[in-house]
Amino acid sequence: MHMRIIAVGRIRERFWQDAASYYLRRLSPYTRLDVVEVREEDPIKEGRGILAHLCGGVTVALDEHGESMSSQELALWLQNRIVEGCGSINWIIGGPEGLSQDVLNRSDLQLSLSKMTFPYQMARILLLEQLYRAFKIIKNEPYHR
């Protein structure tokens, strides 16, 4: 399975870069994952940039009004996509202004990481960690407690 994270904005701080690299390395045995960064501008222009980078398959938009899932539920959702033969999943992370309505309309699932608001850099790390956790749950490997 191929996964693509399409994120608005660039991670500039070294500690966020290190955390992202850490989880990207840990995810490599489970999935091909690439990250595309879209320039931060007004949400409509960001939306066009995001939509231009979709790689087919299922699209998940991270949105504060999206569906909440536990780690176990995310693992089950991901496992179902694998069983269905889904070739790719796009994960979209908006910038400070959120996602355009066009992007939300195009998404197959709107997912909320929490009721709390996080900086978009942290949202990327949280998503990577939850994807790693989901694969460990699916493979029944130790990590999730």
From Swiss-Prot:
Pfam families found in the cross-reference section: SPOUT_MTase (PF02590)
First-level EC class: transferase
Reaction it catalyzes: pseudouridine(1915) in 23S rRNA + S-adenosyl-L-methionine = N(3)-methylpseudouridine(1915) in 23S rRNA + S-adenosyl-L-homocysteine + H(+)
GO MF term set: rRNA (pseudouridine-N3-)-methyltransferase activity
Documented EC number(s): 2.1.1.177
Keyword Lyase recorded: no
Subcellular location: Cytoplasm
InterPro entries per record: Alpha/beta_knot_MTases (IPR029028), RlmH-like (IPR003742), tRNA_m1G_MTases_N (IPR029026)
Statement: the UniProt record of this protein carries the keyword Metal-binding: no
Keywords: Cytoplasm, Methyltransferase, rRNA processing, S-adenosyl-L-methionine, Transferase
UniProt binding sites for S-adenosyl-L-methionine: 62, 94, 113-118
One cellular-component annotation, GO: cytoplasm
HAMAP family found in the cross-reference section: 23SrRNA_methyltr_H (MF_00658)
Described function: Specifically methylates the pseudouridine at position 1915 (m3Psi1915) in 23S rRNA.
Record-stated family: Belongs to the RNA methyltransferase RlmH family.
Name the UniProt record assigns to this protein: Putative ribosomal RNA large subunit methyltransferase H
Lineage of the species this protein comes from: Archaea, Methanobacteriati, Methanobacteriota, Stenosarchaea group, Methanomicrobia
